[in-house]
Curated annotation (Swiss-Prot):
InterPro entries: Cyt_b/b6_C, Cyt_b/b6_C_sf, Cyt_b/b6_N, Cytb/b6-like_sf, Cytochrome_b, Cytochrome_b_C_euk/bac, Cytochrome_b_N_euk/bac, Di-haem_cyt_TM. The chain crosses the membrane at residues 33-53, 77-98, 113-133, 178-198, 226-246, 288-308, 320-340, 347-367. Component of the ubiquinol-cytochrome c reductase complex (complex III or cytochrome b-c1 complex) that is part of the mitochondrial respiratory chain. The b-c1 complex mediates electron transfer from ubiquinol to cytochrome c. Contributes to the generation of a proton gradient across the mitochondrial membrane that is then used for ATP synthesis. Belongs to the cytochrome b family. The cytochrome bc1 complex contains 11 subunits: 3 respiratory subunits (MT-CYB, CYC1 and UQCRFS1), 2 core proteins (UQCRC1 and UQCRC2) and 6 low-molecular weight proteins (UQCRH/QCR6, UQCRB/QCR7, UQCRQ/QCR8, UQCR10/QCR9, UQCR11/QCR10 and a cleavage product of UQCRFS1). This cytochrome bc1 complex then forms a dimer. Keywords: Electron transport, Heme, Iron, Membrane, Metal-binding, Mitochondrion, Mitochondrion inner membrane, Respiratory chain, Transmembrane, Transmembrane helix, Transport, Ubiquinone. Heme b b566 binds at residues 97, 196. This is Cytochrome b. GO terms for cellular component: mitochondrial inner membrane; respiratory chain complex III. Binds 2 heme b groups non-covalently. The keyword Secreted does not apply. It comes from Cephalorhynchus eutropia. GO terms for biological process: mitochondrial electron transport, ubiquinol to cytochrome c. Its cofactor is heme b.
Length: 379
């Protein structure tokens, strides 16, 4: 008798996705981040659901409702900090996942890659609207500054900003709609993640060498289920350590002050995971130019497959490309640091140089070095 796992319409889908899925035999721990992102998403939806049971999306009570969650709700403080730090873990996994894709040439699966870029944008939007909800100083001013960037769009900009705000400033209507967006977007992310997996399983996974994977495949279960569980344990351990020992390490102290439209914080800055893009935005003195650079810093990922000039898919055997890749990572870390600094000398010039280097590396240096490496293959 055939196993019900392989015949029942529902279990058949799960079986072909998580159990009998043919997987390359040599994928490293860098391939763990996909499942970790799934775990992060589930944790964020669950903790968010419990927070939403006690939160009130109203300007007069939002801040105190978060304080109420932390003080009066059973384990409310724990759920709140799991959710806040869970977002940080989400972005760490997300950036590692994208970095792995860049390093090993996974972007050559173009449909999977493009859905991935769309997922990144959706997660960033979710994190942004979520940061506004506690209605602290940084929530309010972050929302004001970032939504105001849309006013740089010629002709329709100001109208668009007021339409998003639901008034002439960030107020009650803005908070209510941001809560609605923050609630619905994770479910859209879940649907997109399913499509992401669908496209991935059409081609099968890439592997560190970059050569076709169908030479040597093994079933996903038990080999990679056990490996993913190990990764998940590391993730949960890190998240718990962060939540229980240093819950405010990655947050901003200004957000413990209730939102006040009459008092601007000394340094308005987003959460750490947006700082690299914020630094690129600030490095251009022109408003529209800055907004375009900000958009391009993320959307440049869509053009990566078109910039592939190497005959080899992976960087595993390309030392010069490896050097440039790690230079790019160092540059992104520099931008992250600059994004958190005040706008003064020497941070301004460092930010401008790091921004130029970011685009120059991706658009010029990496494709050129790949062509040189192609020549070296013939030696």
């Amino acid at each position: 008798m055939t196993n019900i796992r392989k015949t029942h319409p529902l279990t058949k889908i799960l079986n072909n996705t998580f159990i009998d899925l043919p997987t390359p035999s040599n994928i490293s721990s860098w391939w763990n981040f996909g499942s970790l992102l799934g775990l992060c998403l589930i944790m964020q939806i669950l903790t968010g659901l419990f927070l939403a049971m006690h939160y009130t999306p109203d300007t007069s009570t939002a801040f105190s409702s978060v304080a109420h969650i932390c003080r009066d709700v059973n384990y409310g403080w724990f759920i709140r900090y799991l959710h806040a730090n869970g977002a940080s873990m989400f972005f760490i996994c997300l950036y590692a996942h994208i970095g792995r894709g860049l390093y090993y040439g996974s972007y050559m699966f173009q449909e999977t890659w493009n859905i991935g870029v769309l997922l990144l944008l959706t997660v960033m939007a979710t994190a942004f609207v979520g940061y506004v909800l506690p209605w602290g100083q940084m929530s309010f001013w972050g929302a004001t500054v970032i939504t105001n960037l849309l006013s740089a769009i010629p002709y329709i900009g100001t109208t668009l900003v007021e339409w998003i705000w639901g008034g002439f400033s960030v107020d009650k209507a803005t908070l209510t709609r941001f809560f609605a967006f923050h609630f619905i977007l994770p479910f859209i992310i879940t649907a997109l993640a399913a499509v992401h997996l669908l496209f991935l399983h059409e081609t099968g996974s890439n592997n560190p060498t970059g050569i076709p994977s169908n030479m040597d495949m093994i079933p996903f279960h038990p080999y990679y289920t056990i490996k993913d569980i190990l990764g998940a344990l590391f993730l949960i351990l890190t998240l718990l350590a962060l939540t229980l020992f240093a819950p405010d390490l990655l947050g901003d102290p200004d957000n413990y002050t209730p939102a006040n439209p009459l008092s601007t914080p000394a340094h308005i800055k987003p959460e750490w995971y947006f700082l690299f893009a914020y630094a690129i935005l600030r490095s251009i003195p022109n408003k529209l130019g800055g907004v375009l650079a900000l958009l391009l810093s993320i959307l440049i990922l869509i053009f990566i497959p078109m910039l592939q000039t190497s005959k080899q898919r992976s960087m595993m055997f390309r030392p010069f490309s490896q050097l440039l890749f790690w230079t790019l990572i160092a540059d992104l870390l520099t931008l992250t640091w600059i994004g958190g600094q005040p706008v003064e000398h020497p941070y301004i010039i460092v930010g401008q140089l790091a921004s130029i280097l970011y685009f120059f590396l991706i658009l010029v240096l990496m494709p050129t070095v790949s062509l040189i490496e192609n020549k070296l293959l013939k030696w």
